[in-house]
């Protein structure tokens, strides 16, 4: 069961424009130098009251006429115990606001998620609704704070929909 580390309702850092950034608990990667080590423990953070959470999210996603993106960070949003929550949130938001861009940060590699999605319908569905995926573990020796949406140069910014259409990993930068 997913647990919430924090929510930033008006985040101008994690996505294009303004996004609602959802930081989930639990990360198996434990990258040295991680800026979010408090999210590693899957039992940390707060339990999520899903009906209340989704009501707030629906209200906030286009509050004051600002069309926000939806960003999932962590922790690790694509770890097994976070998949159901991420899938439910994306599915509901895309049903109401289909043009909402979805960003996901993962410490794993995109191609590994594609392989796992062959036998995991929830992960496959998440990827089918995701616009941009930032992949790869944070590597402290490759730290570069000038990079778009990334903390280290080994990480990639992937156009998920173009990648699924072409069968090749399509990087945006």
For the regions a protein language model found, what residue spans apply to each?
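N-terminal [4Fe-4S]-dependent radical SAM core
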Residues: 1-23, 28, 36-43, 169-170
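N-terminal, charge-rich interaction modules
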Residues: 7, 30, 50-52
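Residues at the C-termini of beta-strands that transition into short coil/loop
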Residues: 8, 137, 161
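Core AdoMet radical
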Residues: 36-51, 65-80, 99-116, 127-141, ...
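A general structural detector for well-ordered alpha-helical segments in enzyme core domains, enriched
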Residues: 53-57, 85-93, 122-126
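Phosphate/pyrophosphate-binding loops at sites that engage ATP/ADP/AMP, CoA/4′-phosphopantetheine
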Residues: 59-65
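P-loop/Walker A phosphate-binding loop and immediately adjacent motor/lid segment at beta-alpha junctions
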Residues: 85-94, 143-173
């Amino acid at each position: 069961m997913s647990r919430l580390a924090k929510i930033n309702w008006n985040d101008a850092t994690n996505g294009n424009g303004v996004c609602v950034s959802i930081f989930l608990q639990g990360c198996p990667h434990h990258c040295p130098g991680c800026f979010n080590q408090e999210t590693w423990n899957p039992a940390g953070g707060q339990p999520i009251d899903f009906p209340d959470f989704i009501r707030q999210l629906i209200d906030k996603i286009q509050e004051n006429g600002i069309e926000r993106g939806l960003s999932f960070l962590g922790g690790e949003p694509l770890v097994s115990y976070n998949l159901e929550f991420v899938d439910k949130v994306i599915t509901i938001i895309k049903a109401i606001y289909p043009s909402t861009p979805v960003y996901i940060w993962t410490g794993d590699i995109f191609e590994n998620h594609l392989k796992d999605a062959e036998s995991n319908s929830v992960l496959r569905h998440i990827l089918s609704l995701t616009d941009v995926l930032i992949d790869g573990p944070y590597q402290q020796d490759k730290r570069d704070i000038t990079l778009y949406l990334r903390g280290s140069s080994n990480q990639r910014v992937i156009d998920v929909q173009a990648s699924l259409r072409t069968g090749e990993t399509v990087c945006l930068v």
